[in-house]
């Protein structure tokens, strides 16, 4: 019984699908390296890595509770633990609260600026699941939530959030719109039936173009914002490789096949890793 319940809790937080928290982790670590002008130290690396995993897991709990009445009508999500009734709403909320408190405990080991910004991050995280009911581009709200590790990373290192952090957040928001639109393309038919709002529905026949434009803006903003990074040739090479991956994703989603769109979404963490690797190697080579 205990083992079964643990398995359901792990399924609730998508433990077997690390792509979700990796999408959060790479831009956060990139910001840590930029703010620190290199390796940020083991303390901050540990805090932000574990904090990212914990908050993404907490977000899954909140999201599944908020979407439980919608998810039962979507083939891909109908068997999620909360939707199927295997985990109660109360259990999911308690688990989410515990995970969020653990993440906050990590934040408390940093500084006052990071602690203050963590409340804003929490507010956006809680708002996203409900944005899908009222906002035609809820992926933009998710983009803010998934990018908030960037200003928090700068705050942890520099005790302030400079303009550069917000520029990087804006660029990263476009990346989130790109990959979450791919994700939304998988469920578009079901979402239309139940009245869910997504960028894939809003963009309509311009969905693929919207995805590719979002990739272009993301990579362009990050390339220009960090143009003066040490050993910039390494970073520019990484941006080029990330661009090739984006083009491949465009090829995958061109026919709007569900499996191919989902594959493109799942592979996005490699694009984020490529950008992070370029940043880390540039500072290492300096």
Curated annotation (Swiss-Prot):
Species, as recorded: Polaromonas sp. (strain JS666 / ATCC BAA-500)
EC number: 2.5.1.39
Protein name (Swiss-Prot/TrEMBL): 4-hydroxybenzoate octaprenyltransferase
Pfam families the record matches: UbiA
HAMAP family cross-referenced by the UniProt entry: UbiA (MF_01635)
Compartments it resides in: Cell inner membrane
Keyword vocabulary terms for this entry: Cell inner membrane, Cell membrane, Magnesium, Membrane, Transferase, Transmembrane, Transmembrane helix, Ubiquinone biosynthesis
Catalysed transformations (reactions): all-trans-octaprenyl diphosphate + 4-hydroxybenzoate = 4-hydroxy-3-(all-trans-octaprenyl)benzoate + diphosphate
Enzyme class: transferase
GO cellular component, one term: plasma membrane
Membrane topology according to the record: Multi-pass membrane protein
């Amino acid at each position: 019984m205990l083992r079964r319940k643990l398995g359901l809790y792990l399924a609730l937080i998508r433990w077997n699908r690390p792509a979700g928290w990796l999408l959060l982790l790479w831009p956060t670590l990139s910001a840590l390296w930029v703010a620190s002008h290199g390796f940020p130290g083991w303390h901050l690396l540990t805090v932000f890595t574990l904090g990212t995993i914990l908050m993404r897991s907490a977000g899954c709990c909140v999201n599944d509770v908020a979407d439980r009445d919608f998810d039962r009508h979507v083939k891909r999500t109908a068997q999620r633990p909360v939707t199927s009734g295997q985990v109660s709403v109360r259990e999911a909320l308690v688990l989410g609260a515990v995970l969020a408190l653990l993440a906050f405990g990590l934040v408390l080991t940093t500084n006052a600026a990071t602690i203050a910004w963590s409340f804003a991050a929490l507010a956006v995280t809680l708002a996203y699941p409900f944005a899908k009911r009222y906002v035609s581009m809820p992926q933009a709200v998710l983009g803010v939530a998934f990018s908030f590790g960037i200003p928090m990373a700068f705050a942890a290192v520099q005790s302030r959030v400079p303009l550069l952090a917000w520029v990087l957040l804006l660029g990263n928001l476009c990346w989130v719109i790109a990959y979450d639109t791919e994700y939304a393309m998988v469920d578009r038919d079901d979402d239309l039936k139940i009245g869910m709002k997504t960028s894939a529905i809003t963009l309509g026949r311009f969905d693929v173009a919207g995805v590719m434009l979002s990739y272009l803006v993301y990579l362009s903003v990050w390339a220009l914002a960090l143009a003066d990074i040490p050993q910039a040739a390494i970073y520019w090479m990484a941006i080029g490789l990330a661009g090739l991956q984006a083009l491949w994703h465009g090829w995958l989603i061109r026919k709007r096949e569900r499996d191919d769109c989902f594959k493109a979404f799942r592979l996005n963490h490699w694009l984020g890793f490529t950008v992070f690797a370029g940043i880390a190697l540039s500072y290492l080579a300096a």
